[in-house]
Amino acid sequence: DRLSSLTPTIPLLSEESDAIDYSLRKSWQRYWLIDPLDGTKEFINRNGEFTVNIALIENGQSVAGVVHVPVTGISYFGGIGIGAWKQNINQLDNEVQLIVSQAMQENSGVRIVASRRHLGEQLDALVEKIENHFGKATLLSMGSSLKMCLLAEGSADIYPRMAPTCEWDTAAAHGILCAAGGEIVDLQFRPLR
């Protein structure tokens, strides 16, 4: 309700709200996309890896996002043209600007982050290909949109998504990742929109 009152002319779409058919909203030039609880299984399992996601979508592209981790008080936020940041609510004077990791150094290995819910043969095959090409590969399993936040802060190099996903699960972190200098691509390495 507060976001709607702050920006009354911008529609709001949430995973938890009534469904708005794509045929109606595809003409929206700008809207808020919210996932009030990303990582439901992580929330149920009380592992701390669930988030609140808010994205601003313009012309079909995530241009700004906020990913908040309630358990730790850490927020990731950013947008196109303003950069990306990480901040702990308990240390408001200690913002950290996010920049994706630089090109991997030879023999440094690849840091792969993956969903603990979607590990399997496809991921194993990809990890093997990466190891054959780059050498060492380190796999970190994590829940929710935190995986893309690790990319944005430079703590991981790649996040292969092998299972279906919904726009509210990725939009906020996508905006942050792009603001930090990263990108999400499809299997043909085209930027995802």
Which residue stretches match the model-derived regions?
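N-terminal subdomain of lithium-sensitive/metallo-dependent phosphomonoesterases centered on the IMPase/IPPase/PAP
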Residues: 1-37, 125-128, 132
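Acidic beta-strand-loop-alpha-helix segment within the catalytic core
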Residues: 54-148, 192-193
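Conserved acidic residues
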Residues: 29-31, 63, 110, 157
